[in-house]
Regions:
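FAD-binding core/adjacent interface of flavoenzyme oxidoreductases
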Residues: 1-9, 25, 80-145
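Glycine-rich FAD pyrophosphate-binding loop
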Residues: 7-9, 23-45
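Glycine-rich Rossmann-fold phosphate-binding loop(s) that bind the pyrophosphate
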Residues: 10-14
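Flexible, glycine-rich phosphate/dinucleotide-binding loops
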Residues: 15, 38, 60, 89, ...
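Residues at secondary-structure transition points
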Residues: 37, 49, 60-64, 128, ...
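N-terminal Rossmann-like dinucleotide/flavin-binding domain of flavoprotein oxidoreductases
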Residues: 43-105
Length: 145
């Protein structure tokens, strides 16, 4: 079981910014996300869409925002657990236990749920033939420009 100060569920912009703020205060965090990369919907669904509501940044794309946030948290050496779906959260004394679908277990006195509009997975085509082509010629998100 991995022990830390804070478990952050969600590696989107809010989860990544939380890492930064916690790091400034000297707190260690781990981040768990269902997706295969950090950035949440900003990077998964809208990497090229302009964002206009970030303080002190007149305009940036979802991809640029994600890159900036990842650069900003580098000094804190935060472990990102990607492709991990949280399956269980329960209290134990003064801590929280979090278990994932990949059998990872974490313990911390604090949890931040930064899931945005919630965890999401693509609606896959329900044809067995498509499963063989996933990641080759059938994609459910923008991977490369």
């Amino acid at each position: 079981m991995k022990k830390t100060d804070v478990i952050i569920i969600g590696a989107g912009p809010v989860g990544l910014f939380a890492v930064h703020q916690l790091g400034i205060k000297g707190l260690k965090a781990v981040v768990i996300d269902n997706l295969d990369k950090a950035g949440g919907q900003c990077i998964e669904l809208y990497p090229d869409k302009p964002i206009y509501d970030i303080p002190a940044v007149p305009e940036c794309t979802g991809e640029e925002l994600t890159k900036r946030l990842l650069e900003q948290i580098k000094p804190f050496k935060t472990e990102l657990y990607l492709n991990e779906r949280v399956e269980e959260v329960h209290p134990e004394k003064d801590n929280w236990i979090v278990k994932t679908n990949n059998k990872e277990e974490f313990i911390a006195p604090n949890i931040i749920i930064a899931g945005g509009v919630s965890s999401f997975e693509p609606r896959k085509i329900s044809l067995k033939e498509c499963e063989k082509l996933e990641g080759k010629s059938v994609f459910y998100a923008v991977r490369n420009k």
